[in-house]
Amino acid sequence: MQSFSISNNASISSYAYPKTASWKIRGESSDCCLWDGVECDEDTGYVIGLDLGGSSLHGSINSTSSLFQLVHLRRLNLGGNDFNYSQVPSRIALLSSLTYLNLSNSMFYGEIPLEITELSHLTSLDLGRNVDSSARNLLELGSFDLRRLAQNFTGLEQLDLSSVNISSTVPDALANLSSLTFLNLEDCNLQGLIPSSFGDLTKLGYLNLGHNNFSGQVPLSLANLTQLEVLSLSQNSFISPGLSWLGNLNKIRALHLSDINLVGEIPLSLRNMTRISQLHLSNNRLTGKIPLWISNLTQLTLVHLRHNELQGPIPESMSKLVNLEELKLEYNHLSGTIEFSMFASLKHLTMLQIRRNNLTVLTNISDNTTLPKFKYLALGDCNLSEFPDFLRSQDELIYLHLGRNRIQGQIPKWLGDIGHKTLSILILRNNLFSGFEQSWELSLLTKLQWLELDSNKLEGQLPIPPPSLIGYSISNNSLTGEILPSLCNLRSLGFLDLSYNKLSGMFPNCLGDFSDSLLVLNLSNNFFHGRIPQAFRDESNLRMIDLSHNQLEGQLPRSLTNCRMMEILDLSYNRISDKFPFWLANLPELQVLILRSNQFFGSIKSPGAMLEFRKLQIIDLSYNNFTGILPSEFFQTLRSMRFSDLKEFTYMQTIHTFQLPVYSRDFTYRYEINLANKGVYMKYWQIPNVIAAIDLSSNAFQGDIPQSIGTLEKVNALNLSNNHLSGDIPSVLGNLANLESLDLSQNMLSGEIPQYLTQLTFLAYFNVSHNQLEGPIPQGKQFNTFDNSSYEGNSGLYMKHLPKKSECSEPPQHPNLPKHQGFNNILPKDIEWIAVVIGYGSGLVVGVVVGLRVSARIPEWFVKTFGRTQGNRRRREVRGVRR
């Protein structure tokens, strides 16, 4: 092992230590059988065991390694190291006596060599969890497929291929491994049906098929696996699986059935599992009440029922589950009033999450009642009106969520006293807090990483949190004054949202200084003035900048080109005076550009070769002073709008995952959008990644509408209103198959409305008023739904027949959006609409306002910046089932 370097960051285990370092201390002349991790045969002296798991090794295993001379080796453990994306060496086949091989969690990359099948004596093979920090599976099965594995390893008792990219169905032949007691195929991109032959693996005590793409029904033959103690089928696409067969598995200790499309009530068959310790049923569609019989499962330590549709009260009988450590009931429809003292008997309870229900929680606890020491406590949306006094004794809190209540008054000083050692995440948003008792300073919370104080009644200067902070959101308060220089001491800051306050002064230069860590910067809706400084450094990781609704002026800083990861840039409603920033095309990830309502001027025709905006989907240049023609090549640069690809539906957002003790927590910063759609100004709380919109309204563009617009088939909304455009309406606009809103009003367009536009079957809003159009108004399909106001101010237009209500008054469903999620209907049911009727020509208002949203799907790594908390170690936390 002399070719390896020793790195403290080469293993994620807290128990790792460099075993090979002791070999040098003992000296090469010493007996190697006495070295750490080495086992020798007592009779022959041959090395038969080598355990270098978690030994902080970094490097690769080359073909000349002395490792392959240990031909008598029976057990080899190299798991938990960093082999730096090297391949599993094919010469490992020389170790033909191996019965145990562990190469897990060690950054091996590429296809598993076929030669490994020559190790026919193996009883345990672990190649699992070779993933990087972005959750990418590094190993592939390749020609070493499951069928060949089943043929060559007939003596296998333990097999772990978790996070190996297999990408196939599971062959029936796998059931030939009849000696298996442990099988982990989690996160292998498996698909199709689970073979019924799995029921023949009757010795299995551990079976993990989670995080795959299995479909259909779960085979009833799994009822034969009566030795199972751990079963995970989570995160698959089963069709309403029936679970009556679970009643046979009375040895189960851990059951993971989250996110598998379960419907109906919590299965009655679970009540036979009297040994069960962990019950995971989250992210399904379970209804009804929490059954009373669940309190008879007295061995339970974890109950996860979050994200379902459960109703009724939390049964008081759950207080009998005296071994309970984690209880997650958030995001259901639970109701009623509960006394918090009901949890006093659960002395081991460290995690309680009951937010986002319809509960009223009474937190007055008598002096002689002793509550458990919580580490994770989520009481959001629990109708609290005062800060819970019982928290005074909760000095082990890591995560505290009291958001969306009605808590008044000041944030108590004792919170700083009890939280200074452990509190990492504090969420107090959407309350009525007016300040901090005795002006105590947030810097007391020295471990704090995430802080949300949005939507309260805080006044005065911006509170400065401790340097440990990664996310800080204090939007929608009444803070005043300038940003203090001490804010720039937050060198780890990744998310900063100070929007919707009354802050003033110059844009702080230092915010650009730590843009290598900063991902989201939102200073919108304040009173900042002056120039945006040339402060954005090389290697910036900024994804989103929102400086809209301020009083900023001058030119755009060219240092923005350093923000190569930028996705959203919103500078609307300022006083910026500059030419069109063609150079922003150098930002390869830019998706949304909002320059609305500034003092930009001149032509948008590039003086040189036009660079491509490769990913731009929303561009708003409205209400500026742009002049000249609309250059054809400008629209040709909008590459991502030219193709209507059916990519996976998501929302534009940035996610950060905290790896906390016991579990991880995702925080999603989801971008929002303001639209004037169908003449109504609305706020959309989420931006689907399939939306494309162009707004060039209220400028002084002239000349013809370029034919090249007709190639932008992905565009949903096009607004060219209130300019000086002339000539005909090009019939190629009929090629915009996804168009839902078209506004050409307040121009000097002439000629007829092309009949070809009737092919736009998604068109829900059409306005050509106040032009010089003539001839018949097209009839049929969506054109039968537009009223006269769409055409007024064109004296030469006429209708052959009066418009009447059509059966297609609602546009067909857009193919790129989920059902009931058209461009005009992407709002969740429970959010507020902001609607103001606007006049003609006022345009499509596309403005990005960023809102903070929190989710807790566990765990999903995303931000590489924070995935490497120590050195350059590349890893993803294991998301698997606890053994």
Predicted features, each with a name:
Residues 1-883:
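Plant-biased, solvent-exposed loop and capping regions
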